[in-house]
């Protein structure tokens, strides 16, 4: 059974950002030479998420508003977690909603998102 493990690191300039990693994952699938199988993409940080959806700026803004409505960053003291000296309780909650990992089929050596 063929497999490939790789780690990608991303640095963003803002507290929250949407990064389209699909091109990076496609390159890794090609590098793996796997023709049929599964691709697991896991956000290896406790406040990072991975999800599949349209890479469209309006949708990103909708996510921003929706997530901030669910778990607003401020006031910081509304969260018990932030009493530990951190200020990222909202990021932990937002990550729970957005998800930790995705699995995508590999068909004919390419990511298969369906028709």
Segments (PLM) and residue ranges:
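Active-site histidine-anchored catalytic micro-motif
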Residues: 1-115
């Amino acid at each position: 059974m063929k497999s490939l493990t790789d780690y990608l690191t991303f640095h963003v300039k803002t507290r929250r950002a949407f990064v389209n990693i699909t091109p990076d994952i496609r390159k890794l699938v090609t590098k793996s030479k796997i023709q049929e199988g599964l691709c697991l993409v896991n956000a290896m940080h406790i406040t990072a998420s991975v999800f599949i959806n349209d890479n469209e700026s309006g949708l990103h803004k909708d996510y921003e508003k929706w997530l901030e409505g669910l778990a607003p960053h401020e006031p910081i003291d509304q969260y018990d977690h932030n009493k530990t000296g951190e200020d990222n309780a909202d990021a932990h909650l937002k990550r729970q909603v957005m998800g930790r990992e995705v699995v995508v089929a590999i068909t004919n050596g390419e990511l298969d998102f369906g028709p």
